[in-house]
Regions:
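Polybasic, glycine- and aromatic-enriched phosphate-binding surface used to engage nucleic acids
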Residues: 251, 352-354, 358-583, 590-612
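Conserved residues in the N-terminal Rossmann fold of short-chain dehydrogenase/reductase
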Residues: 147, 177, 181-184
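Signature of N6-adenine DNA methyltransferases within the class I
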Residues: 92-93, 115-122, 129, 150, ...
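Conserved acidic residues
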Residues: 108, 178, 206, 288, ...
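Class I S-adenosyl-L-methionine
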Residues: 1-150, 154-157, 212, 239, ...
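A solvent-exposed, charged loop/short amphipathic helix patch at secondary-structure junctions
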Residues: 38, 42, 226-234, 436
């Protein structure tokens, strides 16, 4: 990528592109008879030889076809990449997808409806040649490979990459009949059956493959946005992404035995906007195989959570699902690496969590073992000032951005804990973070006149920063008082003994806070007077909770999981016997606690009348 940036700093894209083609031909001693390629290379100014030596061929390297192809993929301005939703597809992804859709039919027809620089067309060419070695490269290009893209530069690149692949293998015809067209694939005026009658005489394509663009609907022109909403069922409502209708299109273009293979974001599984697409996929039962990369980044230069999906025109009884947990450079997966997911477990109106029957049974065991956490405890988020930099203090002496210093009175401050950075009880003991607290013991706002009289320094400070406070919440007036917190939440519920946890954790991390006068921000509290909080902490930090969250919660980069209320609230707390409670109270070895709890949650099928209610 750095080499491309260096070239883009000095030359325009067509100059770089044509220079790379010429360098590749020269480096590999290739002469072309192809009219399209010769016209393309006619009359352009080559990049400087010094840049060829220092950047393209640095350290005496040869411009191999793989490197050339990589340059072509990266030759989009960063701005264009963002707006066009274009991301470089790793070769192992394209190879896996093509392997999944390729058949034994020598007349196999495969389309990439957003072909970009031609990676899927190229991989399809090689895979078909490998399966049918008697077919020439040109014959495959002319009879098996199809492409479409909205950008002429992309369809040209696809043609060039296919010409060079044939040329590299000794095939040098003057003309090649390409099945690559320049058009918006989502435009319903495009009559695919008229463009490619030889395909649709058999009902459609044998396969559709690709890496469709990822563009949120709010980044599209209004007219195009309305067009998609009016013409594609998957896009009719919500903040959809343009890859949704590409999936719908791909399924529409398949013949009765066809397969669709895409790499896309996995957001349609769990967003409200993905509901209409989920309805289509469930009603058709078209999902056949899914490799979910979860929090693993496939595209190194962009933060997209991805999945590979293989769909079929014919309905499937089950979905073969695999979640990846580490970075890979190939997808050499066996059938036993997948778990089977029943379509009946998926509700289009809700987020999709792909679970096997065994996992569903274990989740049911966990949630129904006793009392749900939400019925036993209060689960609340912390205070929300909407201006933490103003209200939070590490020292009572505060200096503002414009150099004014104020000595805030301790009497208007409370101790506050930042749950998002909290690891253990020792950090609570060492915590010196304070918050200006303009509320009385009942949680009501202290009158402005009272603050001015009792806490003149704090009042002067708040008046000084009032312009910033007034900008909170998009400038809407604060209905309580201009110096009140931005939200009412947790003002009267965040004190007392509690368990604190961050919204995101690598593993369960519920920390006991015995300081009743401390409030908190940036996380959740779990409070109850029905059970010893230190015993509850051991349960919530157990391997059972980690397993449960691993199955039902949202993933983030690095393997972190969400511990938001919506994910932890249905976790079940068993009805322990007095003897079991005594064990939990006295045992501090978490491994022994885990073993004990796993037996209760998963092996103790019948609860007897001897069990006590929660204390």
């Amino acid at each position: 990528m750095k080499n491309v940036i260096k070239l883009l700093a000095k030359y325009d894209v067509p100059t770089i592109e044509k220079s790379l083609v010429q360098i590749f031909l020269d480096e590999n001693n290739l002469k072309t008879n192809n009219k399209f390629l010769n016209e393309y290379l006619d009359s352009f100014e080559m990049i400087d030889q010094s840049d060829i030596d220092k950047i393209v061929l640095k350290n005496g390297e040869t411009l191999t076809f793989e490197k050339f192809e990589r340059y072509f993929e990266l030759l989009f301005h960063s701005k264009d990449k963002k707006l066009g939703g274009i991301f470089y597809t790793p070769a192992y992804i394209a190879e896996f997808i093509v392997d999944e859709v390729l058949t034994d039919n020598p007349d196999f027809k495969v389309l990439d409806p957003s072909c970009g620089a031609g990676i899927f067309n190229l991989v399809s060419l090689y895979k078909i040649k490998e399966k049918f070695p008697d077919k020439s490269y040109v014959e495959i290009i002319e009879n098996n490979i199809y492409g479409c893209d909205i950008e002429p530069i992309s369809t040209n690149r696809t043609k060039i990459i296919l010409i060079l692949a044939a040329l590299l293998h000794g095939e040098n015809p003057e003309e090649i009949k390409f099945n690559v067209i320049t058009h918006d694939s989502l435009d319903k005026s495009l009559k695919w059956d008229e463009k490619f009658p030889e395909v649709f005489k058999n009902g459609g394509f044998d396969a559709v493959v690709g890496n469709p663009p990822y563009i949120r609907i709010q980044n599209l022109e209004d007219d195009y946005k309305k067009y998609l909403q009016n013409n594609w069922a998957s896009a009719k409502s919500g903040n959809i992404d343009i890859y949704y209708p590409f999936i719908e299109l791909g399924l529409n273009l398949l013949n009765e035995n066809g397969r669709l293979g895409f790499i896309t974001p996995n957001s349609h599984f769990n967003t409200a906007a993905g509901k209409n697409l989920r309805k289509i996929l469930k009603s058709n039962k078209s999902m056949y195989r899914i490799v979910n990369f979860d929090y693993i980044r496939v595209f190194q230069d962009v933060n997209v959570y991805s999945c590979v999906s293989i769909f079929t025109k014919k309905p499937n009884d089950e979905i073969k699902f695999r979640k990846m947990t580490e970075e890979v450079s190939s997808l050499d997966l066996r059938e036993e690496d997948y778990k089977l997911v029943n379509y009946d477990t998926l509700d289009s109106e809700k987020k999709w969590v792909f679970l096997s029957d065994e996992e569903i049974e274990k989740i049911a065991s966990i949630e129904n073992v006793g009392t749900k956490l939400k019925d036993l405890c209060e689960i609340n988020c912390g205070v929300a000032t909407l201006a933490d930099k103003i209200y939070l203090l590490t020292d009572y002496e505060v200096t503002t951005e414009d150099g004014e210093t104020f000595n805030i009175e301790p009497g208007i401050c409370k101790s506050i804990i930042k749950a998002s950075t909290l690891h253990n009880e020792e950090e609570i003991a060492e915590n010196d973070l304070k918050i200006i607290w303009p509320y009385n013991e009942e949680g009501n706002i202290i009158p402005e006149s009272t603050i001015a009289k009792k806490f003149p320094n704090a009042y002067a400070y708040l008046k000084h920063v009032k312009p910033k406070l007034d900008k909170r919440d998009k400038g809407k007036p604060n209905e309580v008082a201009w110096y009140a917190f931005g939200r009412r939440q947790a003002i009267d519920s965040s004190f007392g003994k509690k368990l604190l946890t961050s919204t995101m954790n690598e593993k369960p991390n519920f920390v006991y806070c015995a300081e009743e006068d401390s409030t908190f921000i940036s996380g959740y509290q779990v409070k109850t007077n029905k059970m010893d909080l230190e015993v509850l902490k051991k349960i919530l930090n157990s391997s059972v909770m980690e397993y449960y969250i691993g199955l039902i919660s949202k993933s983030y980069q690095g393997g972190w999981k969400s511990y938001a209320k919506s994910f932890i609230q249905n976790f079940g707390i068993p009805r322990f016997t007095a003897e079991e409670l005594e064990f939990l109270e006295n045992e501090n070895d978490q491994n022994k606690i885990n073993e004990f709890l796993e037996d209760i949650y998963f092996n103790r099928a019948v609860k007897t009348e001897k069990q006590t209610k929660l204390i």
